[in-house]
């Protein structure tokens, strides 16, 4: 019985994610490729807050106009003509002191909506981005991979 308990304890502790490791606040900085490989976001720091902006799109030009793609789904009419490249879509994240960047928002230019969000490492070069409405149980995850260029 003791052997079974020891084996179970070893299995449980060995399956802890990389995110259980303590990260430094600036570990998140850099350029990240989104899950669909259609865009890259550069995460940067201003003061003690973290932000992200679109720096690359697989399809940077509008298929109809041939001009740079714009934020056409934005609910603010004044922003619909803003270019997607350079758009700040991650705002006001703070590091919790251990493993999570939280209290921020993520803007989805595909639907023009902004969601509460937190970010944590899934593995050394992979972020888990959790966007949600209200409470984090009602939301979805997406995973971004660190980009080397």
Language-model segments: which ranges?
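Short, compact, well-ordered microdomains
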Residues: 117-127
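Central antiparallel beta-sheet cores of small beta-barrel/beta-sandwich binding domains
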Residues: 37-108, 114-116
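Bacterial Sec-dependent N-terminal signal peptides
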Residues: 1-22
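N-terminal helix-cap/turn-to-beta initiation motif at the start of protein domains
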Residues: 19-31
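Short beta-strand segments that buttress and anchor functional surface loops
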Residues: 31-34, 102-109, 129-131
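Generic beta-strand structural signal
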Residues: 45, 95, 121-122, 146
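Edge beta-strand at a domain terminus
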Residues: 124-126, 133-149
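Short polar/acidic secondary-structure junctions
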Residues: 109-111, 120, 133-136
């Amino acid at each position: 019985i003791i052997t079974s308990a020891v084996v179970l304890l070893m299995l449980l502790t060995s399956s802890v994610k990389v995110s259980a490791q303590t990260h430094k606040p600036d570990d998140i900085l850099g350029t990240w490729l989104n899950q669909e490989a259609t865009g890259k976001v550069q995460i940067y720091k201003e003061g003690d807050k973290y932000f992200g902006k679109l720096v690359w799109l697989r399809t940077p030009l509008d298929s109809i106009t041939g001009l740079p793609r714009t934020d056409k789904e934005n609910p603010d009419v004044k922003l619909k003509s803003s270019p997607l490249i350079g758009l700040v879509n991650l705002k006001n994240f703070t590091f919790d002191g251990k493993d999570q960047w939280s209290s921020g928002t993520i803007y989805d230019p595909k639907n023009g909506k902004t969601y509460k969000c937190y970010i944590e490492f899934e593995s050394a070069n992979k972020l888990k981005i959790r966007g949600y409405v209200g409470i984090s149980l009602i939301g979805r995850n997406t995973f971004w991979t660190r980009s080397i260029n």
